[in-house]
């Protein structure tokens, strides 16, 4: 059967065609057929005109017998052809369905003789996979038992019931009996009744399996009958009858339309091929195995002997031929193929004379031994190739343009490239039959590449974490220290807000969703989450270290003293206070002390404004342990808590308060001394002395209009300042002016002294130079 339009689906050796799916794909091209296809089989006696009928009806090109030469078997096995052109009486304009036609080897042929195993299995297969089974028979065969294949149909019905009878679906097969050479003497209805009675009788007498005892023939099959005129004697009528038959395959919606929904297997085309192959496998395995005969035993012994001789000769030539070529794929594969073919040819020449099944069995074993020996060389070559490809991958990743190509893209591209090259090399060995199974090698290659990519990924991750740490740690320290050095009642709220925002700012480039991050190195969601957790651990440890290192006793005392002095020494506008009375000092002292101690408890225990203790949301220790939150004693016998929020112990708090009280008390005493000094600085009699001694000047001022005007202005200014209590700001302005004047005078004097000193030094250097010249 050489026609390109058909393939041998099952050959005469009962082997299913492994490229059936590719054939279907070639037939339909890129079209999405879905369920819009149909399968038809033809079944009947050998040389009964089955292939001829199919060719005329479906425009196929199955081989047919030339009766003028010899009546013999033409169709061997089961052949499959595709068509969309059905011979009909009218033209069908709409798109016709895809029809796949199975031409089954004829039954009752002399070539197989009494071996009816294949024809039974072929008939059963045709019923199992087809929607319509055309039973081709001659009119004169009706009424016969063997001649019209009733015995075969009985066997097929029995096996069909045992294999497929328990299915709960409503699938049926249409048995279309085509009665050939129908001359019309006996009406078609009479012939159909005869065949129907025979089939019903056969079904009644079947040995039905459990669960199918009450089943009917019509539960599984529908019956249709068509008569065709004699092809040679009534050629025109035969053609017309065939066209009428074709109408029933294309006229949808009519009563005689053959492709009814219940006949379809409801499988896509590629699913049907798998179903057909499984059916044939199930049918083929349903047999008894025969014991080997003496002839088979001899064949096994001789083929084993020939195989060993060929293998020994192969091994003797192998090493010296292969060693120089291990680094060149083309030369290596050519030599391996040559050695292998020489070995198999030697075996074939001698062993092919024995039983074919034994010969092929031993040949397969020899081929396996050869491949096993060759696999060592192939593995060595592929391992060397793996190292080279890995070096290429590392180079490509390290030399990538980081501005335009991400790590993941670079690794993916490099991995794809080396996998392609590796697979191409491996496929070369496989196509040449040198490598039977590549699963182990592929797995090893994949595992090795994944492990090495993991190393690259770890290095990239380490670099990313390093960059994040470089920015995160100092930024976090600076912000925390700044907030703690100027604390408020809500300082811990501010610290935690700043803590979260600092983390977020440093890893915002990797955020994909809320609380979800992708660090762009090809990690899974859980792995990215783990890295994010590690970054938080780093941040929390930095926060913990910064807080506990900064908030020592001396630092807290200094913070409290600064807060005290901000209120005690300066008013609300930031101006220095001028004390008048001790009561004013004492009142301000109490306010300043309260202001300072507002944050004492805040700095002793890290709690939010809602009085909730701050607890890290990640483990602070290297490993979780039950000791993390326990109290421990230091070398000096002082108890401490391991909790982040616990900053000062009770003993440390007392120490802070003692130091703070001492320092602020000193400040208050100094302020009170300044009042006493101011009050006792000028004795009252000085004012009397000034009045007596300055009387002449006073009279001179009164007599001079200019002096009088200045006196009035100064007096009014003095009154206003005194009336509204503006002496404090005036004193501040005067002090500032005096201070600036003093500073300016000092700078001028310093500049004058420095310049004078430089002039003297220059003169001395000139004198020194002259003296040296004189000495020379």
UniProtKB/Swiss-Prot annotation:
<feature type="transmembrane region" description="Helical">
    <location>
        <begin position="682"/>
        <end position="702"/>
    </location>
</feature>
<keyword id="KW-0378">Hydrolase</keyword>
<feature type="topological domain" description="Cytoplasmic">
    <location>
        <begin position="1"/>
        <end position="681"/>
    </location>
</feature>
<dbReference type="GO" id="GO:0003924">
    <property type="term" value="F:GTPase activity"/>
</dbReference>
<feature type="binding site">
    <location>
        <begin position="44"/>
        <end position="51"/>
    </location>
    <ligand>
        <name>GTP</name>
    </ligand>
</feature>
<keyword id="KW-0472">Membrane</keyword>
<dbReference type="GO" id="GO:0005789">
    <property type="term" value="C:endoplasmic reticulum membrane"/>
</dbReference>
<comment type="function">
    <text>Cooperates with the reticulon proteins RTN1 and RTN2 and the tubule-shaping DP1 family protein YOP1 to generate and maintain the structure of the tubular endoplasmic reticulum network. Has GTPase activity, which is required for its function in ER organization.</text>
</comment>
<dbReference type="InterPro" id="IPR030386">
    <property type="entry name" value="G_GB1_RHD3_dom"/>
</dbReference>
<dbReference type="InterPro" id="IPR008803">
    <property type="entry name" value="RHD3/Sey1"/>
</dbReference>
<feature type="domain" description="GB1/RHD3-type G">
    <location>
        <begin position="34"/>
        <end position="263"/>
    </location>
</feature>
<dbReference type="InterPro" id="IPR046758">
    <property type="entry name" value="Sey1/RHD3-like_3HB"/>
</dbReference>
<dbReference type="InterPro" id="IPR027417">
    <property type="entry name" value="P-loop_NTPase"/>
</dbReference>
<protein>
    <recommendedName>
        <fullName>Protein SEY1</fullName>
        <ecNumber>3.6.5.-</ecNumber>
    </recommendedName>
</protein>
<keyword id="KW-0342">GTP-binding</keyword>
<comment type="similarity">
    <text>Belongs to the TRAFAC class dynamin-like GTPase superfamily. GB1/RHD3 GTPase family. RHD3 subfamily.</text>
</comment>
<keyword id="KW-0256">Endoplasmic reticulum</keyword>
<keyword id="KW-0812">Transmembrane</keyword>
<feature type="transmembrane region" description="Helical">
    <location>
        <begin position="706"/>
        <end position="726"/>
    </location>
</feature>
<keyword id="KW-0547">Nucleotide-binding</keyword>
<comment type="subunit">
    <text>Interacts with RTN1 and YOP1; GTP binding is not required for these interactions.</text>
</comment>
<keyword id="KW-1133">Transmembrane helix</keyword>
<dbReference type="GO" id="GO:0005525">
    <property type="term" value="F:GTP binding"/>
</dbReference>
<dbReference type="GO" id="GO:0016320">
    <property type="term" value="P:endoplasmic reticulum membrane fusion"/>
</dbReference>
<dbReference type="Pfam" id="PF05879">
    <property type="entry name" value="RHD3_GTPase"/>
</dbReference>
<feature type="topological domain" description="Lumenal">
    <location>
        <begin position="703"/>
        <end position="705"/>
    </location>
</feature>
<dbReference type="Pfam" id="PF20428">
    <property type="entry name" value="Sey1_3HB"/>
</dbReference>
<feature type="topological domain" description="Cytoplasmic">
    <location>
        <begin position="727"/>
        <end position="776"/>
    </location>
</feature>
